[in-house]
């Protein structure tokens, strides 16, 4: 509120109308209230010190300019936080007692006429959780003097007459016409803006379905994006699983390749040993025993290599132990059957020889053994048929037939019969069919003695040492047959070994 500002409004307090006038003078606030009906007047003048002390006592300090601005806003009713009220002295005391917590109306005390005629203009400042009252005391001035009023009326009339003589009314008419013209322009602009607003509203209402369609399209695209993300995640998981399976299959194939290489190496070693044994004849019993020891050592090495290959091919410990156990059983049976089946025919010697007796117990045991071996053969055949891998089937076929060594004739005619060491080694390394092995591995007497394979078996260590007749035709014929059979077996081994090497080469090319 600036100096020289005068604010005047008509307000209604407790059912009565009052004219409120607030004037800002030099460092002074003047408040004047007059009753519209009775013309009673109340007037008060307040300085900055009084106003600031009053606000400090209420607990909410305000500076003098701020208080004047608050009072102006209350007169104009431009703010809801400040209002005005007009109270008498008794009403003010009642308000104070209510704030102090006194219940009931206080006793009426004798009051002076000045206090009873005094009025209090209350400036009420309302904050969020509190209301502060600033009371301004206004002493009673009484009714206005009629002479003064008439004097004021005359002054106003003269002022009006002076303004009329100066032609101010014409100027005011021009200003009125100008204002009316501006008003018409503003109305035209308003109508144009209203029409533009209507058009915009119509366009907005028409484009609403398009916007809704765009929202639906965006929503559907988001759903498709989520579906594609889920689908890509599932496909990635599936691809990773397939990759893991392929890696496992690759490891299995590499292990199978290593096992096959070990098998090829063992078969190559076996073939070399067979060829070396075929080229080296058995000269004597002592030499045969030494060769037997050497071949037994090579057989032990070959057996260890074969077992290593079996371990590499199969991941089952129980199958390895079962195969080792069956192999050892077959080796022992082959050795025992070889020693039992080597029954020599007596040569025409003048001294004569003892005829072997028929042993029924050995015959029954031999027949039971043959039955068990036939059952084992059928079980192995079923197991081989169930295997789907060609490498396993090839290994099963390569194991099922082993070469039968050729029996070599000794150089000296006076030495005793010796069983072929190569036949014993082939029995130890064979894991195929026992019945086929027995047909191929029937030992021949190097001195022309004929074995009785279908006859009764003789216990180990009861061989009759006789001087064989080297000129016997049957011996030469059997030796030729044995050479032909051994050659055929070696050819078959070579063919199978070549097929296995071709398969290994195909595996290497496939990787």
UniProtKB/Swiss-Prot annotation:
GO molecular function: identical protein binding
Stretches with biased composition (Polar residues): 338-352
GO biological process terms, semicolon-separated: cell projection organization; centriole assembly; mitotic spindle assembly
Keywords: Cell projection, Cilium biogenesis/degradation, Coiled coil, Cytoplasm, Cytoskeleton
Gene Ontology CC terms, in alphabetical order: centriolar satellite; centriolar subdistal appendage; centrosome; ciliary basal body; cytoplasm; microtubule organizing center
Disordered, as annotated region: 306-403, 447-486
Region of interest: Head domain: 1-144
UniProt subcellular location: Cytoplasm, Cytoskeleton, Microtubule organizing center, Centrosome; Cytoplasm, Cytoskeleton, Microtubule organizing center, Centrosome, Centriolar satellite; Cytoplasm, Cytoskeleton, Cilium basal body
Residue stretches in coiled coil: 147-272
Hydrolase is among the record's keywords: no
Biased composition (Basic and acidic residues): 315-335, 366-378
Major localisation: cytoplasm
Domain notes: The coiled-coil domain is involved in microtubule-binding.
Task of the protein: Microtubule-binding centrosomal protein required for centriole cohesion, independently of the centrosome-associated protein/CEP250 and rootletin/CROCC linker. In interphase, required for anchoring microtubule at the mother centriole subdistal appendages and for centrosome positioning. During mitosis, may be involved in spindle assembly and chromatin alignment by regulating the organization of spindle microtubules into a symmetrical structure. Plays a non-essential role in ciliogenesis.
Assembly and binders: Forms homodimers (via head domain).
Note: The N-terminal 3D structure (head domain) resembles that of NHEJ1/XLF, PAXX, SASS6 and XRCC4.
Entry similarity comment: Belongs to the CCDC61 family.
Entry protein name: Centrosomal protein CCDC61
Gene coding for it: ccdc61
